[in-house]
């Protein structure tokens, strides 16, 4: 069977699984045009089955393989080089509030009316709309008449998704332009410090870290994106949280990572800690945790992170790539890798692969005892004493 036929058969099999799960759990109808057809399917609060999630993963991988197989290389590479235009178009959409404007204009918006409402050039707006329509974000129902589609419904200007996407597609895109110099400059190429992140040279340009930059009043708009987009739960804190905290049983203990732990416990939880340090310092931190764990028999350490992952290891060139994805790593590995790049752009730090994690754990006298994957790109790794 040819490679294309192998991909086609894999897609048939996984689409059958997905449609069965969608029907079984009443998840709606996956499609691209109707914003309401896939409400449950898209709702992050509605946990889809593992079978559905795994089918989605496999379909995405094989669809991309099919696209790569049938696309001449000069077209494939040209399209990849032009990706920043798509990202910029997305930033225009969320920053101007195109989704809201289409709704305000009755759902089917003439391009001239849309440009007038947004106070932008009609011809340039048309190019933005068609760029995003090609990605199934909006739909052109008639010539120069645009409507929202399934993937644009979460782009309301004040929504947390739009704020987060604006951060990625504006400041994130600008930071990414500094990656090459970050990787080749003798001062920064081996550094994981926040002060050496691409953001500092490409955006801040004053040696300031990301958080120093957004602390200035003139950069409050970026800070707002972080609050509304990255930390949307801050908008929904209970009014009596201060009293609840005062009445709680949680005790905060000041801790220096590089000194003996000031507290004891059954569970040690690390999130965004190890990524801040190179291997030498990360091993020192883990060694301190391991020493504390020895004081409490059966204690564990849990690490919650996104890992640098391999979308597939090509051990068989005739197999569908969806069958070649390693198991113990982040799910949606292509997306996980993009997210680890974005954290490097903004904050520096060393995002690791699971084998790289195992290396520093072993040096500290620890090992992975359990590996928990979620239906997203983050994982929980439970570690115990070796």
Where are the predicted features?
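Class I SAM-dependent transferase core
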Residues: 87, 205-234, 339
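Alpha-helix initiation and N-capping motif
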Residues: 63, 74, 161, 176, ...
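Extracellular structured ligand-interaction cores
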Residues: 93, 135, 176
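Residue-level detector of alpha-helix boundaries and kinks
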Residues: 51, 83-84, 117, 164-165, ...
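A short, conserved structural fragment
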Residues: 133-145
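Leucine-rich, amphipathic alpha-helical/linker segments
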Residues: 147-216
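Alpha-helical subdomain
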Residues: 1-129, 140-142, 228-386
């Amino acid at each position: 069977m040819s490679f294309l036929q192998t991909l086609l058969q894999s897609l048939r099999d996984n689409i059958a699984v997905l449609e069965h799960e969608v029907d079984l759990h009443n998840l709606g109808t996956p499609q691209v045009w109707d914003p309401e057809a896939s409400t449950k399917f898209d709702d992050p609060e509605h946990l889809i089955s593992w079978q559905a999630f795994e089918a989605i993963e496999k379909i995405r991988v094989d669809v991309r393989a099919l696209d790569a197989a049938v696309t001449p290389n000069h077209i494939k590479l040209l399209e990849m080089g032009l990706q920043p235009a798509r990202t910029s178009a997305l930033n225009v959409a969320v920053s101007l509030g195109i989704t809201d404007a289409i709704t305000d204009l009755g759902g089917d918006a003439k391009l001239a009316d849309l440009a007038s409402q947004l106070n932008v050039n009609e011809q340039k707006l048309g190019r933005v709309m068609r760029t995003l329509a090609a990605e199934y974000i909006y739909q052109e129902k008639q010539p120069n008449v645009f409507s929202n589609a399934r993937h644009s419904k979460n782009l309301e200007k004040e929504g947390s998704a739009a704020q987060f996407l604006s951060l990625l597609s504006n400041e994130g895109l600008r930071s990414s332009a500094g990656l090459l110099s970050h990787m080749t400059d003798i001062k920064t190429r081996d550094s994981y410090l926040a002060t050496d992140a691409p953001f500092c040279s490409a955006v801040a340009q004053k040696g300031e870290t990301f958080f120093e930059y957004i602390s200035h009043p003139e950069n409050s708009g970026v800070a707002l994106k972080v609050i509304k987009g990255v930390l949307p739960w801050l908008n929904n804190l209970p009014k009596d949280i201060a009293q609840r905290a005062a009445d709680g049983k949680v005790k905060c203990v000041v801790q220096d990572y590089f000194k003996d732990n000031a507290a004891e416990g059954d569970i040690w939880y690390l999130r965004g800690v190890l990524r801040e340090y190179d291997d030498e310092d990360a091993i020192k931190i883990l060694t301190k945790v391991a020493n504390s764990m020895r004081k409490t028999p059966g204690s564990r350490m849990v690490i919650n992170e996104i890992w640098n992952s391999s979308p597939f290891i090509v051990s068989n060139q005739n197999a569908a790539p969806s069958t070649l994805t390693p198991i113990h790593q982040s799910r949606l590995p292509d997306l996980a890798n993009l997210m680890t790049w974005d954290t490097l752009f903004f904050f520096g730090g060393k995002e690791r692969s699971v084998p790289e994690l195992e290396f520093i754990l072993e040096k500290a006298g620890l090992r992975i005892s359990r590996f928990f994957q979620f239906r997203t790109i983050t994982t929980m790794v439970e570690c115990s004493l070796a």
